[in-house]
């Protein structure tokens, strides 16, 4: 959704990656999924990186993979600099990303959590809305 929002890509940190494209696990070369699919259908072979021969997979962070260091640093800096930190549609159960709301709160931000279910961070929030996100957004005309 954030790609379709019109926000400049340079302002987006994808802590958990992105399933709309793929990356080489060795050199991080980006590949478009449609091209990989076409190549696979032609050869019936799993794709390998054209640069280094590494394994290519969707650009999401899988269980056991480290969080992307650069994106974590940017996100931590933005949390510290924020005066309002809004968590939308997240269980806040995956660390270290789940620490970001507390980091923002500890440095003076107002913390808002909007999620269909309660989270373990609700107790720290200034405002908690446990409702369907689409209903809330339609009511406030976002």
Stretch-by-stretch model annotation:
Residues 1-142:
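Conserved catalytic alpha/beta core of Sir2/sirtuin-type deacylases, generalized to analogous enzyme cores
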